[in-house]
Amino acid sequence: MMADEKKTPENEAETATPAVAVEDALKAEPTETLEAQKAKAEAETPAVAETPSEAAANQSAAQGAEGQPRERGGHDRGGRGGRGGNDRGRGRGGRDNRRGGRREEEDDGIIEKLVHINRVSKTVKGGKRFGFAALVVVGDGQGRVGFGKGKAREVPEAIQKATAAARKKMIRVALKEGRTLHHDGNGRFGAGKVTVRTAPPGTGIIAGGPMRAVFESLGVADVVTKSVGTSNPYNMIRATFDALQDQTSPKSVAQRRGKKVADLLGRGGASEAEAEADAAAIAE
């Protein structure tokens, strides 16, 4: 037998398989990092040089932008500085315009006056529930007036309910020359008694408390009133409306009786033309 040959490093390298040799070679070579590869690629890429005309144009555009004030929010985006754009309208201006539109739609010439607010409570099994009651008078200032009341847990909601109820129950009152009542009248509700009287021009509204709100909303400029028996605003308002509902105009009386308005005025000493003029002024 032949003697075993001693294994040396040279012999091991010769007998190694090709795959192992390739793996050892890869381990021996240093690997490049990702940053190094990017830097190498940028260095190899040639830079594009600007022409003299392009450089001058860019410089002039930059100087012009620095000289002009910066606009915040344009017509396209509708930013806050631009006060709302034409396309989207999301800025402050767009919101304000929409709010103003709603206000114009709600403002239909009706006068709203808050007469009284009081706190109310309801006793339930778990305790007391507190709320608010509102009394509101509304009118158009041209002979129509109404009142309503509303209850809610919050004051604004109570006022809103009272206003809606008042708008539904408006009545028309005949006015003389558009400024005062045609004749005196009395009204009563509960313990409250109210007296209303016609007045000459320049008298003003001689009324206090809830009654003044009624005549201001009605459009009366001259009237004298008196209230006795109660200071409850609800009773005073109801008594005032009772007196106003009894108001009649000479025109309506003449129609019921089949006569002319001039005949009802009793102007025996006046001419027919003057009587007709007075009748036209007094009629609705």
Swiss-Prot record:
Which stretches are tagged as biased composition: Low complexity?
14-23, 44-67
Ranges of compositional bias, category Basic and acidic residues: 1-10, 24-43, 68-105
Residues of the signal sequence?
none
Is the keyword RNA-binding in the record? Answer: yes
Pfam families reported in the protein's UniProt record: Ribosomal_S5 (PF00333), Ribosomal_S5_C (PF03719)
Q: Which Gene3D superfamilies match?
A: 3.30.160.20, 3.30.230.10
A GO cellular component annotation here is: small ribosomal subunit
The intrachain disulfides are none
Tell me where in this chain the S5 DRBM domain is found: 110-173
Q: Which GO terms describe its molecular function?
A: rRNA binding; structural constituent of ribosome
Give yes or no: UniProt keyword Iron-sulfur.
Answer: no
- Its function? With S4 and S12 plays an important role in translational accuracy.
Q: What is known of its domains?
A: The N-terminal domain interacts with the head of the 30S subunit; the C-terminal domain interacts with the body and contacts protein S4. The interaction surface between S4 and S5 is involved in control of translational fidelity.
Quaternary structure, per UniProt, is: Part of the 30S ribosomal subunit. Contacts proteins S4 and S8.
Q: Which family does it belong to?
A: Belongs to the universal ribosomal protein uS5 family.
- Designated name of the protein: Small ribosomal subunit protein uS5
Chain's gene name: rpsE
